[in-house]
């Protein structure tokens, strides 16, 4: 269950770094590093069977989904970055919501 969190950690960190190197965007760098760190911590907690990992991954995925939708609406999802953010957030939210329902019926 921790593999999606580690994957999302890598992808969000790489996306933040790419946004910084291509456009010099400090907000992209900060958000990529923050989301990457949160997903990394969630993955670690899930791997160690500690409390809070599932909720942390679900919360980060929901925020990522919201950020993608908010960024995509003005451009009607014609730009690739909001589409990727929305897709990653949606997939993460779907996965971790189903896992949450599985463990806490």
UniProtKB/Swiss-Prot annotation:
<keyword id="KW-0812">Transmembrane</keyword>
<keyword id="KW-1133">Transmembrane helix</keyword>
<feature type="transmembrane region" description="Helical">
    <location>
        <begin position="77"/>
        <end position="97"/>
    </location>
</feature>
<dbReference type="GO" id="GO:0005739">
    <property type="term" value="C:mitochondrion"/>
</dbReference>
<feature type="transmembrane region" description="Helical">
    <location>
        <begin position="26"/>
        <end position="46"/>
    </location>
</feature>
<keyword id="KW-0472">Membrane</keyword>
<protein>
    <recommendedName>
        <fullName>TMEM14 protein homolog YJR085C</fullName>
    </recommendedName>
</protein>
<dbReference type="InterPro" id="IPR005349">
    <property type="entry name" value="TMEM14"/>
</dbReference>
<dbReference type="InterPro" id="IPR044890">
    <property type="entry name" value="TMEM14_sf"/>
</dbReference>
<dbReference type="GO" id="GO:0016020">
    <property type="term" value="C:membrane"/>
</dbReference>
<keyword id="KW-0496">Mitochondrion</keyword>
<feature type="transmembrane region" description="Helical">
    <location>
        <begin position="53"/>
        <end position="73"/>
    </location>
</feature>
<dbReference type="Pfam" id="PF03647">
    <property type="entry name" value="Tmemb_14"/>
</dbReference>
<comment type="similarity">
    <text>Belongs to the TMEM14 family.</text>
</comment>
């Amino acid at each position: 269950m921790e593999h999606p969190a580690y994957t999302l950690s890598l992808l969000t960190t790489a996306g933040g770094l790419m946004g910084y190197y291509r456009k010099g965007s400090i907000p992209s760098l900060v958000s990529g590093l923050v989301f990457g760190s949160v997903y990394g911590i969630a993955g670690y907690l899930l791997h160690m069977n500690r409390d809070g990992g599932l909720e942390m991954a679900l919360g980060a995925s929901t925020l990522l989904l919201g950020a993608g939708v908010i960024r995509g609406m003005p451009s009607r999802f014609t730009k690739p970055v909001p589409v990727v953010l929305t897709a990653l957030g949606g997939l993460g939210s779907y996965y971790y919501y189903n896992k949450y329902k599985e463990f806490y019926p």
